[in-house]
Amino acid sequence: MKIKHLEDLNTLVSLSKRRGFVFQSSEIYGGLGSCWDYGPLGSLMKLNVKRAWWNAMTRRPDIVGLDAAILMHPMVWKASGHVDGFSDPLVDCKECKTRFRADNTDSYINEKKCPNCGSKNLSEERSFNLMFKTHMGPLEDSGSVVYLRPETAQGHFVNFQNCQQASRYKIPFGIAAIGKSFRNEITPGNFIFRTREFEQMEMQYFVEPGTDEQFFKEWKERRWNFYIKFGIKPENLKFKDHDKLAHYAKAAVDVEFKFPMGFSELEGIHNRSDFDLSQHMKFSGKNLEYFDEPNKKKYIPYVIETAVGCDRLFLAFLCDAYREEVTTDEAGKEDVRVVMGLHPEIAPFKVAVLPLSKKEELSSISEKLRDQLAEDFDVNYDESQSIGKRYRRQDEIGTPFCVTVDFDTINDQAVTVRHRDKMTQERVAITQLNAYIAAKLKTFNQ
Protein backbone atom coordinates (compact mmCIF):
# COMPACT_ATOMS: atom_id res chain seq x y z
CA MET A 1 0.00 0.00 0.00
CA LYS A 2 1.22 3.48 -0.92
CA ILE A 3 0.45 6.52 1.24
CA LYS A 4 0.06 9.93 -0.40
CA HIS A 5 -0.18 13.06 1.73
CA LEU A 6 -1.73 16.38 0.80
CA GLU A 7 0.22 18.24 -1.89
CA ASP A 8 -2.32 20.70 -3.32
CA LEU A 9 -4.46 22.96 -1.14
CA ASN A 10 -7.21 22.90 -3.80
CA THR A 11 -7.79 19.22 -2.99
CA LEU A 12 -8.65 20.21 0.57
CA VAL A 13 -10.79 23.17 -0.52
CA SER A 14 -12.87 20.83 -2.70
CA LEU A 15 -13.24 18.21 0.04
CA SER A 16 -14.14 20.89 2.58
CA LYS A 17 -17.05 22.12 0.49
CA ARG A 18 -18.25 18.66 -0.56
CA ARG A 19 -18.27 17.26 2.96
CA GLY A 20 -19.41 20.40 4.79
CA PHE A 21 -16.27 21.59 6.55
CA VAL A 22 -15.96 25.07 5.00
CA PHE A 23 -18.06 27.01 2.46
CA GLN A 24 -17.39 30.25 0.61
CA SER A 25 -19.25 33.00 2.46
CA SER A 26 -22.25 34.51 0.60
CA GLU A 27 -21.62 32.05 -2.22
CA ILE A 28 -25.02 32.57 -3.92
CA TYR A 29 -23.98 36.21 -4.46
CA GLY A 30 -20.59 35.28 -5.85
CA GLY A 31 -18.85 35.14 -2.49
CA LEU A 32 -16.92 37.75 -0.54
CA GLY A 33 -13.14 37.75 -0.79
CA SER A 34 -11.40 35.65 1.86
CA CYS A 35 -14.55 35.23 3.95
CA TRP A 36 -15.57 31.69 4.83
CA ASP A 37 -18.42 29.92 6.62
CA TYR A 38 -17.93 26.77 8.68
CA GLY A 39 -20.46 24.11 7.69
CA PRO A 40 -22.07 21.27 9.68
CA LEU A 41 -18.79 19.36 10.06
CA GLY A 42 -16.58 22.44 10.24
CA SER A 43 -18.55 24.06 13.04
CA LEU A 44 -18.30 20.85 15.09
CA MET A 45 -14.59 20.47 14.42
CA LYS A 46 -13.84 24.13 15.12
CA LEU A 47 -15.61 23.82 18.46
CA ASN A 48 -13.40 20.80 19.23
CA VAL A 49 -10.25 22.75 18.28
CA LYS A 50 -11.24 25.58 20.61
CA ARG A 51 -12.16 23.18 23.40
CA ALA A 52 -8.80 21.40 23.13
CA TRP A 53 -6.92 24.71 23.42
CA TRP A 54 -9.20 26.09 26.15
CA ASN A 55 -8.85 22.99 28.31
CA ALA A 56 -5.07 22.95 27.85
CA MET A 57 -4.98 26.49 29.22
CA THR A 58 -7.75 26.95 31.78
CA ARG A 59 -7.56 23.54 33.45
CA ARG A 60 -4.20 24.60 34.80
CA PRO A 61 -4.33 26.02 38.34
CA ASP A 62 -2.71 29.31 37.27
CA ILE A 63 -4.76 30.48 34.25
CA VAL A 64 -8.19 32.12 34.16
CA GLY A 65 -10.51 32.77 31.23
CA LEU A 66 -11.75 36.04 29.76
CA ASP A 67 -14.27 37.03 27.09
CA ALA A 68 -13.62 40.70 26.33
CA ALA A 69 -15.70 42.95 24.06
CA ILE A 70 -14.79 43.32 20.39
CA LEU A 71 -15.38 47.08 20.57
CA MET A 72 -13.06 48.84 23.02
CA HIS A 73 -12.29 52.44 23.95
CA PRO A 74 -10.29 53.91 21.03
CA MET A 75 -7.54 54.99 23.44
CA VAL A 76 -6.76 51.30 23.99
CA TRP A 77 -5.51 51.16 20.39
CA LYS A 78 -3.66 54.45 20.73
CA ALA A 79 -1.81 53.12 23.77
CA SER A 80 -1.03 49.77 22.14
CA GLY A 81 0.48 51.44 19.08
CA HIS A 82 -2.11 50.13 16.62
CA VAL A 83 -3.50 53.54 15.60
CA ASP A 84 -0.07 54.88 14.63
CA GLY A 85 1.86 51.76 13.74
CA PHE A 86 -0.38 48.82 12.75
CA SER A 87 0.13 49.13 9.02
CA ASP A 88 1.67 47.46 5.98
CA PRO A 89 3.46 49.11 3.04
CA LEU A 90 1.10 49.05 0.04
CA VAL A 91 1.99 49.33 -3.68
CA ASP A 92 -0.37 49.60 -6.68
CA CYS A 93 0.42 48.35 -10.17
CA LYS A 94 -0.73 51.05 -12.62
CA GLU A 95 -1.01 48.52 -15.46
CA CYS A 96 -3.08 45.62 -14.04
CA LYS A 97 -4.40 47.43 -10.92
CA THR A 98 -3.06 44.71 -8.58
CA ARG A 99 -2.36 45.80 -5.01
CA PHE A 100 0.30 44.04 -2.99
CA ARG A 101 2.45 44.34 0.11
CA ALA A 102 5.87 45.79 -0.55
CA ASP A 103 7.58 44.00 2.33
CA ASN A 104 6.91 40.35 1.43
CA THR A 105 6.59 40.24 -2.37
CA ASP A 106 9.79 38.81 -3.87
CA SER A 107 9.36 40.24 -7.38
CA TYR A 108 9.01 43.73 -5.91
CA ILE A 109 11.80 43.39 -3.34
CA ASN A 110 14.28 41.99 -5.88
CA GLU A 111 13.31 43.68 -9.16
CA LYS A 112 10.66 46.32 -8.34
CA LYS A 113 8.18 44.41 -10.55
CA CYS A 114 4.47 43.65 -10.18
CA PRO A 115 3.98 40.03 -9.03
CA ASN A 116 0.94 39.69 -11.32
CA CYS A 117 1.92 41.18 -14.70
CA GLY A 118 5.62 41.98 -14.31
CA SER A 119 5.19 45.70 -14.99
CA LYS A 120 7.51 48.22 -13.39
CA ASN A 121 4.92 50.99 -13.67
CA LEU A 122 4.17 51.06 -9.95
CA SER A 123 2.97 53.58 -7.40
CA GLU A 124 5.05 54.82 -4.52
CA GLU A 125 4.85 52.79 -1.32
CA ARG A 126 2.27 54.08 1.12
CA SER A 127 1.28 53.03 4.61
CA PHE A 128 -2.04 51.17 4.92
CA ASN A 129 -3.57 50.77 8.40
CA LEU A 130 -5.00 47.29 8.90
CA MET A 131 -7.69 48.19 11.44
CA PHE A 132 -11.36 48.29 10.45
CA LYS A 133 -12.84 51.62 11.52
CA THR A 134 -16.51 52.20 12.31
CA HIS A 135 -18.68 54.59 14.34
CA MET A 136 -20.57 54.11 17.59
CA GLY A 137 -23.87 55.94 18.00
CA PRO A 138 -26.02 57.97 15.58
CA LEU A 139 -23.33 60.45 14.47
CA GLU A 140 -20.45 59.63 12.16
CA ASP A 141 -17.82 62.09 13.32
CA SER A 142 -14.34 61.90 14.78
CA GLY A 143 -15.74 61.63 18.30
CA SER A 144 -17.66 58.44 17.51
CA VAL A 145 -14.82 56.45 15.90
CA VAL A 146 -14.23 52.94 17.23
CA TYR A 147 -12.33 49.98 15.80
CA LEU A 148 -13.01 46.31 15.32
CA ARG A 149 -10.25 44.82 17.42
CA PRO A 150 -7.24 43.54 15.45
CA GLU A 151 -6.24 41.22 18.32
CA THR A 152 -7.72 39.87 21.55
CA ALA A 153 -4.57 40.55 23.59
CA GLN A 154 -5.40 44.11 24.60
CA GLY A 155 -8.47 42.84 26.45
CA HIS A 156 -6.13 40.85 28.66
CA PHE A 157 -3.99 43.87 29.48
CA VAL A 158 -6.78 46.32 30.32
CA ASN A 159 -8.41 43.61 32.47
CA PHE A 160 -5.18 42.45 34.12
CA GLN A 161 -6.01 44.04 37.45
CA ASN A 162 -9.68 43.00 37.36
CA CYS A 163 -8.79 39.36 36.69
CA GLN A 164 -5.99 39.26 39.25
CA GLN A 165 -8.07 40.79 42.03
CA ALA A 166 -11.25 38.81 41.26
CA SER A 167 -9.44 35.46 41.09
CA ARG A 168 -6.99 36.37 43.91
CA TYR A 169 -4.24 34.69 41.89
CA LYS A 170 -0.66 35.60 42.59
CA ILE A 171 1.96 36.10 39.91
CA PRO A 172 2.84 34.09 37.88
CA PHE A 173 -0.63 33.61 36.41
CA GLY A 174 -2.24 33.82 32.98
CA ILE A 175 -5.36 35.05 31.21
CA ALA A 176 -6.71 33.05 28.26
CA ALA A 177 -9.27 34.14 25.68
CA ILE A 178 -10.83 32.97 22.43
CA GLY A 179 -12.48 35.56 20.20
CA LYS A 180 -12.98 37.15 16.81
CA SER A 181 -10.48 39.68 15.49
CA PHE A 182 -10.44 41.69 12.28
CA ARG A 183 -7.61 42.89 10.03
CA ASN A 184 -8.05 44.58 6.68
CA GLU A 185 -5.30 42.48 5.09
CA ILE A 186 -3.89 43.67 1.76
CA THR A 187 -3.23 40.15 0.49
CA PRO A 188 -5.43 37.58 2.24
CA GLY A 189 -5.62 34.12 0.74
CA ASN A 190 -4.63 30.45 0.78
CA PHE A 191 -8.13 29.38 1.80
CA ILE A 192 -8.63 30.00 5.56
CA PHE A 193 -4.92 30.57 6.21
CA ARG A 194 -5.15 34.37 6.06
CA THR A 195 -8.54 36.05 6.29
CA ARG A 196 -9.86 39.46 7.27
CA GLU A 197 -12.17 38.04 9.94
CA PHE A 198 -10.63 35.33 12.08
CA GLU A 199 -10.71 33.77 15.51
CA GLN A 200 -7.75 34.01 17.87
CA MET A 201 -6.77 31.89 20.85
CA GLU A 202 -4.39 33.93 23.00
CA MET A 203 -2.93 33.58 26.47
CA GLN A 204 -0.97 36.24 28.32
CA TYR A 205 1.13 34.91 31.21
CA PHE A 206 2.15 37.59 33.74
CA VAL A 207 5.50 37.02 35.44
CA GLU A 208 8.01 38.80 37.65
CA PRO A 209 10.76 40.61 35.71
CA GLY A 210 13.88 38.47 35.75
CA THR A 211 11.89 35.21 35.50
CA ASP A 212 10.58 35.98 32.00
CA GLU A 213 13.28 34.16 30.03
CA GLN A 214 12.69 30.90 31.89
CA PHE A 215 8.92 31.10 31.41
CA PHE A 216 9.44 31.91 27.73
CA LYS A 217 11.38 28.64 27.37
CA GLU A 218 8.74 26.69 29.30
CA TRP A 219 5.88 27.98 27.16
CA LYS A 220 7.75 27.13 23.97
CA GLU A 221 7.97 23.53 25.14
CA ARG A 222 4.36 23.39 26.31
CA ARG A 223 3.00 24.70 23.03
CA TRP A 224 5.10 22.27 20.97
CA ASN A 225 3.83 19.39 23.09
CA PHE A 226 0.22 20.53 22.56
CA TYR A 227 0.52 20.00 18.81
CA ILE A 228 2.19 16.63 19.19
CA LYS A 229 -0.49 15.51 21.67
CA PHE A 230 -3.24 16.22 19.16
CA GLY A 231 -1.61 14.28 16.39
CA ILE A 232 0.40 16.73 14.30
CA LYS A 233 3.50 15.03 12.96
CA PRO A 234 6.78 16.40 14.40
CA GLU A 235 8.32 16.60 10.92
CA ASN A 236 5.60 19.08 9.95
CA LEU A 237 6.54 21.49 12.76
CA LYS A 238 9.52 23.71 13.46
CA PHE A 239 10.47 26.74 15.53
CA LYS A 240 11.58 29.91 13.76
CA ASP A 241 13.13 32.78 15.70
CA HIS A 242 12.22 36.29 14.57
CA ASP A 243 15.04 38.11 12.78
CA LYS A 244 13.41 41.45 13.54
CA LEU A 245 11.49 41.99 16.77
CA ALA A 246 8.22 43.90 17.06
CA HIS A 247 8.29 47.14 19.04
CA TYR A 248 6.81 45.39 22.10
CA ALA A 249 8.95 42.24 22.07
CA LYS A 250 12.04 41.25 24.01
CA ALA A 251 12.05 37.82 22.32
CA ALA A 252 9.82 36.10 19.75
CA VAL A 253 9.56 32.71 18.09
CA ASP A 254 7.01 31.19 15.73
CA VAL A 255 5.80 27.62 15.66
CA GLU A 256 5.66 26.96 11.92
CA PHE A 257 3.65 24.22 10.20
CA LYS A 258 4.35 22.69 6.81
CA PHE A 259 1.29 23.75 4.81
CA PRO A 260 1.03 22.74 1.12
CA MET A 261 2.45 26.19 0.24
CA GLY A 262 5.43 25.65 2.56
CA PHE A 263 6.34 26.28 6.20
CA SER A 264 4.35 29.22 7.59
CA GLU A 265 3.47 30.62 10.99
CA LEU A 266 0.99 28.66 13.06
CA GLU A 267 1.54 30.25 16.47
CA GLY A 268 3.57 33.12 17.86
CA ILE A 269 5.24 32.96 21.28
CA HIS A 270 6.47 36.33 22.53
CA ASN A 271 8.20 37.86 25.52
CA ARG A 272 6.35 41.20 25.50
CA SER A 273 8.33 42.57 28.49
CA ASP A 274 6.33 45.20 30.41
CA PHE A 275 5.50 47.19 27.28
CA ASP A 276 1.73 46.74 27.27
CA LEU A 277 0.98 47.38 30.93
CA SER A 278 3.39 50.34 30.93
CA GLN A 279 1.66 51.86 27.92
CA HIS A 280 -1.80 51.46 29.43
CA MET A 281 -0.57 52.97 32.70
CA LYS A 282 0.76 55.93 30.76
CA PHE A 283 -2.36 56.54 28.65
CA SER A 284 -5.04 55.70 31.26
CA GLY A 285 -3.37 57.23 34.29
CA LYS A 286 -4.15 54.06 36.28
CA ASN A 287 -1.55 52.25 38.36
CA LEU A 288 -1.22 48.71 37.02
CA GLU A 289 1.72 47.70 39.19
CA TYR A 290 1.52 44.41 41.04
CA PHE A 291 2.30 44.31 44.77
CA ASP A 292 4.28 41.25 45.80
CA GLU A 293 3.09 40.85 49.40
CA PRO A 294 5.66 38.26 50.64
CA ASN A 295 8.59 40.32 49.32
CA LYS A 296 7.00 43.72 49.98
CA LYS A 297 7.78 45.12 46.54
CA LYS A 298 5.95 46.53 43.54
CA TYR A 299 6.68 45.92 39.88
CA ILE A 300 5.10 46.03 36.45
CA PRO A 301 4.78 42.39 35.33
CA TYR A 302 6.41 41.09 32.19
CA VAL A 303 4.19 39.12 29.80
CA ILE A 304 4.78 35.86 27.96
CA GLU A 305 2.25 35.56 25.14
CA THR A 306 1.10 32.54 23.17
CA ALA A 307 -1.10 33.41 20.19
CA VAL A 308 -2.58 31.03 17.63
CA GLY A 309 -5.29 31.53 15.03
CA CYS A 310 -8.09 29.01 15.43
CA ASP A 311 -8.80 29.02 11.69
CA ARG A 312 -5.15 28.46 10.86
CA LEU A 313 -4.90 25.62 13.38
CA PHE A 314 -8.10 24.11 11.93
CA LEU A 315 -6.41 24.18 8.51
CA ALA A 316 -3.21 22.65 9.90
CA PHE A 317 -5.13 19.76 11.46
CA LEU A 318 -6.84 19.02 8.13
CA CYS A 319 -3.62 19.29 6.12
CA ASP A 320 -1.71 17.06 8.52
CA ALA A 321 -4.49 14.46 8.77
CA TYR A 322 -5.27 14.06 5.06
CA ARG A 323 -3.92 10.95 3.38
CA GLU A 324 -4.69 8.75 0.40
CA GLU A 325 -4.11 5.01 0.78
CA VAL A 326 -3.51 3.51 -2.66
CA THR A 327 -3.79 -0.26 -3.13
CA THR A 328 -3.50 -2.30 -6.33
CA ASP A 329 -5.41 -5.54 -6.96
CA GLU A 330 -4.16 -8.56 -8.92
CA ALA A 331 -5.48 -7.08 -12.17
CA GLY A 332 -3.47 -3.91 -11.60
CA LYS A 333 -6.48 -1.74 -10.81
CA GLU A 334 -5.83 0.96 -8.23
CA ASP A 335 -8.17 1.70 -5.35
CA VAL A 336 -7.82 4.89 -3.31
CA ARG A 337 -9.13 5.28 0.24
CA VAL A 338 -9.14 8.91 1.40
CA VAL A 339 -8.70 9.15 5.16
CA MET A 340 -8.83 12.22 7.37
CA GLY A 341 -6.74 10.82 10.21
CA LEU A 342 -7.81 13.39 12.80
CA HIS A 343 -7.14 12.95 16.49
CA PRO A 344 -10.41 11.68 18.06
CA GLU A 345 -10.78 14.81 20.20
CA ILE A 346 -10.57 16.99 17.08
CA ALA A 347 -12.75 14.87 14.74
CA PRO A 348 -16.28 16.27 14.20
CA PHE A 349 -17.99 12.95 14.93
CA LYS A 350 -16.60 10.30 17.25
CA VAL A 351 -18.81 7.50 15.99
CA ALA A 352 -21.20 6.78 13.11
CA VAL A 353 -24.18 4.42 13.26
CA LEU A 354 -24.71 2.50 10.02
CA PRO A 355 -27.70 0.13 9.72
CA LEU A 356 -26.97 -2.58 7.15
CA SER A 357 -30.47 -2.18 5.73
CA LYS A 358 -33.26 0.40 5.79
CA LYS A 359 -35.72 -2.27 6.93
CA GLU A 360 -37.78 -1.29 9.95
CA GLU A 361 -36.38 -3.95 12.27
CA LEU A 362 -32.84 -2.57 11.80
CA SER A 363 -33.79 1.12 11.58
CA SER A 364 -35.60 1.07 14.91
CA ILE A 365 -32.62 -0.55 16.68
CA SER A 366 -30.18 1.83 14.94
CA GLU A 367 -32.12 4.97 15.87
CA LYS A 368 -32.27 3.90 19.53
CA LEU A 369 -28.55 3.14 19.41
CA ARG A 370 -27.84 6.57 17.92
CA ASP A 371 -29.72 8.21 20.81
CA GLN A 372 -27.86 6.04 23.33
CA LEU A 373 -24.46 7.02 21.92
CA ALA A 374 -25.45 10.69 21.59
CA GLU A 375 -25.65 10.93 25.38
CA ASP A 376 -21.84 10.77 25.41
CA PHE A 377 -20.58 11.51 21.88
CA ASP A 378 -21.19 13.48 18.69
CA VAL A 379 -22.81 10.86 16.46
CA ASN A 380 -23.48 10.66 12.72
CA TYR A 381 -26.29 8.49 11.36
CA ASP A 382 -26.08 7.24 7.77
CA GLU A 383 -28.29 4.64 6.09
CA SER A 384 -27.96 5.48 2.38
CA GLN A 385 -25.89 3.52 -0.20
CA SER A 386 -23.78 0.41 0.36
CA ILE A 387 -21.98 -0.19 3.65
CA GLY A 388 -18.64 0.07 1.83
CA LYS A 389 -19.43 3.55 0.48
CA ARG A 390 -20.63 4.64 3.88
CA TYR A 391 -17.38 3.47 5.48
CA ARG A 392 -15.47 5.54 2.90
CA ARG A 393 -17.56 8.63 3.63
CA GLN A 394 -16.82 8.35 7.34
CA ASP A 395 -13.11 7.77 6.64
CA GLU A 396 -13.03 10.95 4.57
CA ILE A 397 -14.48 13.10 7.36
CA GLY A 398 -12.31 11.55 10.08
CA THR A 399 -14.86 9.55 12.12
CA PRO A 400 -12.81 7.24 14.39
CA PHE A 401 -15.42 4.47 14.74
CA CYS A 402 -18.28 3.09 12.66
CA VAL A 403 -20.94 0.94 14.31
CA THR A 404 -22.78 -1.44 11.98
CA VAL A 405 -26.20 -2.78 12.95
CA ASP A 406 -26.92 -6.03 11.06
CA PHE A 407 -29.57 -8.74 11.15
CA ASP A 408 -27.60 -10.71 13.78
CA THR A 409 -28.08 -7.71 16.08
CA ILE A 410 -31.78 -8.58 16.40
CA ASN A 411 -30.89 -11.83 18.14
CA ASP A 412 -27.54 -11.26 19.86
CA GLN A 413 -28.01 -7.55 20.77
CA ALA A 414 -24.46 -6.83 19.58
CA VAL A 415 -22.99 -4.64 16.84
CA THR A 416 -19.81 -4.55 14.74
CA VAL A 417 -17.40 -1.71 15.55
CA ARG A 418 -14.90 -0.73 12.84
CA HIS A 419 -11.68 1.22 13.57
CA ARG A 420 -10.96 4.00 11.02
CA ASP A 421 -7.18 3.63 10.76
CA LYS A 422 -6.66 -0.07 11.39
CA MET A 423 -9.92 -1.13 9.65
CA THR A 424 -10.21 -3.90 12.24
CA GLN A 425 -13.67 -4.98 13.37
CA GLU A 426 -14.93 -6.18 16.71
CA ARG A 427 -18.30 -7.43 17.96
CA VAL A 428 -19.54 -5.49 21.00
CA ALA A 429 -22.70 -5.83 23.10
CA ILE A 430 -25.04 -2.84 22.81
CA THR A 431 -25.17 -2.51 26.60
CA GLN A 432 -21.37 -2.11 26.69
CA LEU A 433 -21.02 0.08 23.60
CA ASN A 434 -20.75 3.55 25.20
CA ALA A 435 -18.11 2.37 27.65
CA TYR A 436 -16.26 0.53 24.87
CA ILE A 437 -16.16 3.60 22.59
CA ALA A 438 -15.07 5.88 25.45
CA ALA A 439 -12.20 3.55 26.37
CA LYS A 440 -11.09 3.09 22.76
CA LEU A 441 -11.11 6.83 22.07
CA LYS A 442 -8.63 7.35 24.91
CA THR A 443 -6.21 4.81 23.44
CA PHE A 444 -7.06 5.33 19.75
CA ASN A 445 -3.52 5.76 18.46
CA GLN A 446 -1.91 3.13 20.67
UniProtKB/Swiss-Prot annotation:
EC number(s) per UniProt? 6.1.1.14
EC main group: ligase
GO biological process assignments = glycyl-tRNA aminoacylation
Q: Catalyses which reaction? A: tRNA(Gly) + glycine + ATP = glycyl-tRNA(Gly) + AMP + diphosphate
Recorded GO CC terms: cytoplasm
Would the keyword Nucleotide-binding be found if you checked this record's keyword annotation? yes
Name the job this protein performs: Catalyzes the attachment of glycine to tRNA(Gly).
Its protein name is Glycine--tRNA ligase
- Organism source for this protein? Bdellovibrio bacteriovorus (strain ATCC 15356 / DSM 50701 / NCIMB 9529 / HD100)
Gene name linked to the record: glyQS
